[in-house]
UniProtKB/Swiss-Prot annotation:
This protein's name: Small ribosomal subunit protein uS9
Family designation: Belongs to the universal ribosomal protein uS9 family.
Gene from which the chain derives: rps9
Pfam families (alphabetical): Ribosomal_S9
UniProt KW keywords: Ribonucleoprotein, Ribosomal protein
PROSITE patterns, alphabetized: RIBOSOMAL_S9
InterPro entries assigned: Ribosomal_Su5_D2-typ_SF, Ribosomal_uS9, Ribosomal_uS9_archaeal, Ribosomal_uS9_CS, Ribsml_uS5_D2-typ_fold_subgr
Biological classification of the source: Archaea, Methanobacteriati, Thermoplasmatota, Thermoplasmata, Thermoplasmatales
Length: 133
């Protein structure tokens, strides 16, 4: 195991960089403890890789810097970055299989983007109504 590992996770326009190192079980998001994250459902989503890790989470510290996007995109990017960093730090194939079985999207960046608006419409697919015919 090296001193620290840096991994990146992306979702929509959000980019999260997770730094994992030996420690005492502290998990910071942009310098604040993860327990202070205001949206509970997103906080639980970000804690999933740590919950899968179990008792071994007490021997590491994870510091995540995330920017861009909105709340959900940032939460998904954070979750992906943390899961990738945990797998590389512990180098445990059983742990990777467990995370992959729980949710494959924790290890794969979601590349979907918003479809651009088209001319003569209100959005990507919606069109203005025609009053004739």
């Amino acid at each position: 195991m090296s001193d620290y590992i840096i991994k990146v996770g992306k979702r929509k326009t959000a980019i999260a960089r997770a730094i994992i190192r030996k420690g005492s079980g502290k998990f910071l998001i942009n310098g604040y403890p993860i327990e202070l994250y205001p949206i509970e459902i997103l906080r639980e989503k970000m804690l999933e890789p740590i919950r899968i890790l179990g008792d071994r989470s007490k021997e590491i510290d994870i510091d995540v810097n995330v920017h861009g996007g909105g709340n959900t995109g940032q939460a998904d990017a954070t979750r992906t970055a943390m899961a990738k960093a945990i797998i590389e730090y512990f180098k445990d194939s059983d742990l990777e299989a467990e995370i992959r079985a729980y949710d494959r999207s924790m290890l794969v960046n979601d590349v979907r983007r918003k479809m651009p608006k088209k001319p003569m419409g209100y959005g990507a697919r919606a069109k203005r109504q025609k009053s004739y015919r």
